[in-house]
């Protein structure tokens, strides 16, 4: 995906210092998300946590939702690496181990970006077209490649139809995402991928 911003909101080319300030604002937002709801974040709080002014915040982002969208783009880049798991050959003799590696990689991305991905889904569910498009740009390739993997394991001659494989991939993706979105403390009590062993 290679998400990169080269200009600020005023159309000026971002140099090293500008890129660093933008990165600090994004890092501060991510830190604040660990203790605050995304709907409670303010540009002032983010700028203060980043050690800059709110005027600087608006040089790089339109509003808090804009910085959360930028963080969602980074999460999408990480999720594209998980999707690439489907591009390599899976050993059918140890298919459960292959599936577990996929689930663990998926959970790892969610652990890194949980608050941002929850917000992405919230805004998509509320009808924000930017967040909906971003979510679908992640979901569709994942589900398509997952369905293709299901078909390769149990081809049409084996009784599974293409539509069934897509339905199974959709349900499995939804289940994986729901578990990954769950509070980490709950996951550490033995729910999720550790139960698959």
Residue ranges and their predicted role:
Residues 1-20, 154, 158-161, 188-191:
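N-terminal intrinsically disordered/low-complexity leader segments
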Residues 33, 40, 67-75, 120, ...:
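Alpha-helical DNA-contacting segments of helix-turn-helix folds
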Residues 13, 71-98, 117, 152:
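Amphipathic alpha-helical linker/stalk segments
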Residues 42, 117-121, 132-133, 158-159, ...:
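Short, hydrophobic secondary-structure boundary micro-motifs
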Residues 77, 81-83, 108-112, 119-122, ...:
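Amphipathic alpha-helical packing segments from all-alpha helical-bundle domains
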Residues 18-29, 46, 71-79, 146:
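Generic hydrophobic, amphipathic alpha-helix propensity
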Residues 24, 28, 32-66, 70:
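Helix-turn-helix
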Residues 70, 84-112, 165-172:
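Hydrophobic alpha-helical connector segments
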């Amino acid at each position: 995906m290679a998400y990169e911003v080269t200009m600020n909101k005023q159309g000026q080319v971002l140099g090293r210092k500008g890129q660093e300030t933008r990165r600090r604002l994004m890092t501060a937002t991510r830190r604040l998300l660990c203790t605050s709801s995304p709907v409670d974040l303010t540009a002032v709080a983010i700028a203060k946590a980043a050690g800059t002014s709110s005027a600087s915040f608006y040089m790089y982002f339109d509003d808090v939702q804009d910085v959360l969208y930028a963080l969602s783009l980074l999460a999408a880049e990480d999720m594209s690496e998980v999707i690439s798991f489907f591009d390599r050959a899976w050993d059918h003799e140890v298919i459960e181990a292959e599936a577990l590696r996929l689930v663990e990689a998926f959970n790892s991305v969610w652990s890194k970006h949980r608050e941002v991905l929850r917000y992405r889904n919230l805004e998509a569910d509320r009808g924000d077209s930017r967040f909906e498009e971003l979510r679908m740009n992640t979901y569709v390739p994942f589900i398509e490649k997952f369905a293709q993997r299901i078909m390769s394991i149990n081809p049409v001659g084996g009784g599974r139809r293409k539509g069934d494989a897509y339905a199974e991939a959709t349900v499995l993706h939804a289940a994986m995402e729901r578990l990954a979105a769950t509070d980490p403390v709950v996951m550490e009590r033995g729910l999720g991928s550790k139960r698959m062993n």
